[in-house]
């Protein structure tokens, strides 16, 4: 009876997560597009529901909600379904919609979709060869074979996003990195943009007048007769077409310049708004957060370097370890086990909420940046694939933030994976991503004033 009650709780929560994913799809991703494939919407919502359910089970594990055997069953079921979606269903439909957009392959789209899926499976399987991610005990058809490969891709994605976010967050929030932009700078750039637009209009008028003149001459005058008349008409038309092509090239160059000027003007307006915002109370608060995240970024890079150099992976969760160090240093009586459980629960909850929120914001921005009416279905499926892999790998990494007694079922469900490898791999990719982001933002910040002065 308790199993039925536990299952009804899980099904209800999954329905709620599915509904939230459906609303997010309708309200955020596809609100500007008329063409909607319901199979894409269902796949995205199901992926979102089962991804969130994994985080829900982590919280249930810490709080002791549901029976232990029920949690184990739903962990196993949830993991099997999410792997089925990520490895078989989503890649196949991505290939199917890619082929559907190619007219030459339209008649045999099912066949070519299968070919693309088999190609994906080949490279997906070969991905596990260079990495020490499995125990030798696992067979070729075991669930660990799939989790291990999905984990490598997901951890790589998480580390890339975390490395960039750790650097970009203080860069975005801190007023120290803002350029000094005045109204005179904006007016000067807008004046140059208007001058460029005037030049484009005048040159397009010249082209239009020339075309009209050539058309009228062809209408009014009879075709030239005689040998010399034909030579004269050919040379005149060639010279005229060359002049028009030169003017058109100038127009193309000016239009490209106008696009750059427009983007630069928008950037200056945004910077000016950020300067004004930084003077408000909320802006000062985010500026303080920027300094805090700067310290956190330096600390994370330092710890990642230490972990890589000394091949170190923590055996104790960070909260328990931090409390033990503080208690020993201060020499006070403190129930480390009791409080570490509660603080770990709060920490894991914050990680889960911020992970879901941050990923959804990133997915929305990414979708708007590259989608179109033809590619939107493929992009949504790619986002579903990224989201699922991201959440599976989050479970692999969050496991280390939990006290040992809460890791048991998660470890049993995930199997005998080489968990230390994933943490070491995360540190390597995080370090590369963070250092690359620092270099990129430094060059962009240094180049921006020079570009502004040149304009």
Curated annotation (Swiss-Prot):
Which keywords has UniProt assigned to this entry?
Answer: Glycoprotein, Golgi apparatus, Ion channel, Ion transport, Membrane, Protein transport, Transmembrane, Transmembrane helix, Transport, Voltage-gated channel
* GO BP: any one term: protein transport
Has UniProt tagged this entry with the keyword Aminoacyl-tRNA synthetase?
no
Give the UniProt subcellular location, in the record's own words.
Golgi apparatus membrane
Regarding protein family, the annotation reads: Belongs to the Golgi pH regulator (TC 1.A.38) family.
The protein's organism comes out as Gallus gallus (Chicken)
- Where do transmembrane segments lie in this chain? 5-25, 46-66, 79-99, 111-131, 150-170, 290-310, 343-363, 378-398, 425-445
InterPro entries, A to Z: ABA_GPCR_dom (IPR025969), Golgi_pH-regulator_cons_dom (IPR022535), GPHR/GTG (IPR015672)
Question: Which purpose does this protein serve, as stated in its record?
Answer: Voltage-gated channel that enables the transfer of anions such as iodide, chloride, bromide and fluoride which may function in counter-ion conductance and participates in Golgi acidification.
Q: What is this protein called?
A: Golgi pH regulator
Alphabetically, the GO molecular function entries are:
voltage-gated monoatomic anion channel activity
State any GO CC term. Answer: Golgi cisterna membrane
Glycosylated residues? 67, 180, 243
Q: Which reaction does it catalyse?
A: iodide(out) = iodide(in); chloride(in) = chloride(out); bromide(in) = bromide(out); fluoride(in) = fluoride(out)
At the top level, the lineage of the source is Eukaryota
Q: Which Pfam families does the record associate with it?
A: ABA_GPCR, GPHR_N
Q: How does it sit in the membrane?
A: Multi-pass membrane protein
Subunit comment:
Homotrimer.
